């Protein structure tokens, strides 16, 4: 287990941190940063974001009386230092491991994790709700939301600020401005924040006036009114344009150096006494303190395990060619298709490297768009493109598509527009946990009229489904879901073939039991059949490809021949693929024993994908066991 520094090891709670002399905080920060480097290099995890807020994390817990004062982290990639300072240092080596600490703040894990996070742009809304509740209950608490400039591009953050500005709630928004999300930040807001950081005249003169008057709370309402008038005059005369946050009635302070710990402590102490909603703009460097991470912030967002001295990232080596990641199949295939079809466009909400649309952005910059953390906009922007005869491929992680459900229905499917949704990270997201699992898309998509819902079993099917979806004769909305991680076919670049919409395929014949699978999880069925071969059990296997329209012709054949049927999916059982099969059985008056394997009706925590598949009973061994049980075979 990694050992912390001599001062850090004495801190098991923020209460102990607050007992230190302020002069000791720099040492705490240095040891905290090193502890993060030591742990992530050995165990993996999100890296650069947490390094960038070490000083801010120490200052917040030093100044505010957490957990009485409530601290909300947006997304949570940057919260490792927070976890270490709040009693989880000794268990931090279990971070993002099965049955270990969550990689994100989680209410059930610690009272210091006041709000569970994982998706972006939620912190201001949550902290404002807490602040209004405290005000109603007459609790004298501070409420702090820490949000990055990337997350600030999400519309929900602006909805929250719009509301906060008409309250007098005790809310402090700390803007962690590092010009990055996972990829470099995009959009006009980025340029606006850069303008603020360079307009220092207003901030310098205002600081001089404040220093002259002293801390306004010491002088009573008259001095406060004078200071307010002086400040208003400064704004009018020195700012070229009105401050966005001030226009929303949120008092703006900054920008300040987010790595100047002593100054942060001073500023945060001052802000504690200023009532109403306010924002502190801090400038930080993502990856601060680890030179390689500062230099390449995208690569070091979550690099995996690495040599902390050399920076060499540990990558598995193989003697034989390996299958690609599904995201790379998408990234290369959309370029191939776009080279032949000039109507194809690519859209992603802030995940270009994660979904590999960055390949198209580099090669065809006028046809590929990173629209920021804005899933709702991404979908309706795609719909707008489609109205003009273009063919948008809108790539959104399955878990983030939840945020744009209304737009899929209202803006795309009701109008039957030719938008192609590529849902990356469908199924279990692994160690990122329940906030990132893509468990629900099959269920929430298959109930929408006009929408084709498909899932490839391998890389070739992904390519061919993408090819099929963009054909002009297929004018309606089309979705393709595929998992995180590696495929199964090293030689995947084969000529395109059109797939008949709504038609599955028989993978293998068999006797007695039929297994119907959807998507990549069908490869587990192949492994299960191999396990059963020595037992002379040979279930038939059907790769259905489509949940909607489902292949009714194939289902008729299956139900006429087999009375024992297993469905397998890496999505939620309620309303999913297996439910569609049961609906078909009921509607057509078939009688059969049907066992559904998939994600049960509960929140599944984090762990490696294989661990979670086993837990939920649809790994190869569990599938084989289900076949044995249906066949009445008992292992000796």
Curated annotation (Swiss-Prot):
Binds 1 Mg(2+) ion per subunit. Its cofactor is Mg(2+); thiamine diphosphate. SUPFAM superfamilies: Thiamin diphosphate-binding fold (THDP-binding), TK C-terminal domain-like. One of its GO terms (biological process) is terpenoid biosynthetic process. Keywords: Isoprene biosynthesis, Magnesium, Metal-binding, Thiamine biosynthesis, Thiamine pyrophosphate, Transferase. It catalyses: D-glyceraldehyde 3-phosphate + pyruvate + H(+) = 1-deoxy-D-xylulose 5-phosphate + CO2. Coiled coil: none annotated. Its EC number is 2.2.1.7. Catalyzes the acyloin condensation reaction between C atoms 2 and 3 of pyruvate and glyceraldehyde 3-phosphate to yield 1-deoxy-D-xylulose-5-phosphate (DXP). Homodimer. Belongs to the transketolase family. DXPS subfamily. This is 1-deoxy-D-xylulose-5-phosphate synthase. It comes from Cytophaga hutchinsonii (strain ATCC 33406 / DSM 1761 / CIP 103989 / NBRC 15051 / NCIMB 9469 / D465).
């Amino acid at each position: 287990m990694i050992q912390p520094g001599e001062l850090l090891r004495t801190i098991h709670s923020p209460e102990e941190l607050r007992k230190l002399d302020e002069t000791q905080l720099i040492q705490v920060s240095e040891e905290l940063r090193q502890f993060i480097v030591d742990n992530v290099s050995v165990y993996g995890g999100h890296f650069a974001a947490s390094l960038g807020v070490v000083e801010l994390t120490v200052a917040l817990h030093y100044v505010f009386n957490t957990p009485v004062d409530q601290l909300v982290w947006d997304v949570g990639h940057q919260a490792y230092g927070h976890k270490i300072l709040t009693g989880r240092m000794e268990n931090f080596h279990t971070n993002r491991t099965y049955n270990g600490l969550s990689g994100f703040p989680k209410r059930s894990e610690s009272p210091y994790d006041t709000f569970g996070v994982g998706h972006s742009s939620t912190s201001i809304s949550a902290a404002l709700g807490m602040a209004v509740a405290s005000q109603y209950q007459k609790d004298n608490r501070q409420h702090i939301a820490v949000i990055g400039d990337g997350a600030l591009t999400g519309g929900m953050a602006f909805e929250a600020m719009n509301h906060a500005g008409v309250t007098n709630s005790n809310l402090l928004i700390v803007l962690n401005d590092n010009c990055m999300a996972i990829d470099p930040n995009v959009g006009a807001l980025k340029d606006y924040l850069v303008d603020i950081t360079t307009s220092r005249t207003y901030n310098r003169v205002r600081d001089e006036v404040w220093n002259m008057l002293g801390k306004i709370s010491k002088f009573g309402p008259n001095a406060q009114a004078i200071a307010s008038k002086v400040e208003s005059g400064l704004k009018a005369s020195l700012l070229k344009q009105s401050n966005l946050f001030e226009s929303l009635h949120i008092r703006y302070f900054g920008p300040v150096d987010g790595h100047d710990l002593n100054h942060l402590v001073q500023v945060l102490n001052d802000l504690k006494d200023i009532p109403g909603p306010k924002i502190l703009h801090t400038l930080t460097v993502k990856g601060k303190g680890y030179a390689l991470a500062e230099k390449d912030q995208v690569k070091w967002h979550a690099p995996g395990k690495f040599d902390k001295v050399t920076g060499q990232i540990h990558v598995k080596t193989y003697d034989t060619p390996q299958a690609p990641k599904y995201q790379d199949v998408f990234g290369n295939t959309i370029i191939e298709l776009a080279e032949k079809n000039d109507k194809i466009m690519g859209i992603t909400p802030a995940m270009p490297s994660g979904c590999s649309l960055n390949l198209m952005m580099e090669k065809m910059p006028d046809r590929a768009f990173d629209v920021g953390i804005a899933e709702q906009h991404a979908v309706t922007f795609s719909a707008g493109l489609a109205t003009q005869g273009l063919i948008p491929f809108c790539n959104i992680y399955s878990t983030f598509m939840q945020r744009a459900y209304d737009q899929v229905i209202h803006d795309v499917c009701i109008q039957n527009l030719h938008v192609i949704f590529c849902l990356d990270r469908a199924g279990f997201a692994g160690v990122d946990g329940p906030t990132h699992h893509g468990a629900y898309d099959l269920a929430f998509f298959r109930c929408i009229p006009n929408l084709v819902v498909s899932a490839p079993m391998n890389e070739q099917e992904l390519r061919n489904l993408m090819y099929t979806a963009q054909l002009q004769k297929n004018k309606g909305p089309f979705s393709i879901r595929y998992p995180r991680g590696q495929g199964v076919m090293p030689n995947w670049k084969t000529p395109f073939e059109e797939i008949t919409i709504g038609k599955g395929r028989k993978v293998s014949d068999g006797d007695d039991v039929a297994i119907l699978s959807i998507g990549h999880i069908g490869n587990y069925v192949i492994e299960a059949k191999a396990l059963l071969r020595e037992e002379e059990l040979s279930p038939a296997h059907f790769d259905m490809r489509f949940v909607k329209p489902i292949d009714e012709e194939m289902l008729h054949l299956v139900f006429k021949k087999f009375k024992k049927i297993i469905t397998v999916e890496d999505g939620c059982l309620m309303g999913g693929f297996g439910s569609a099969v049961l609906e078909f059985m009921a509607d057509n008056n078939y009688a059969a024993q049907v066992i559904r394997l998939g994600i049960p009706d509960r929140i599944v925590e984090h762990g490696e994908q294989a661990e979670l598949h086993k837990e939920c009973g649809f790994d190869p061994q569990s599938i084989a066991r289900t076949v044995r049980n249906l066949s009445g075979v008992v292992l000796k």
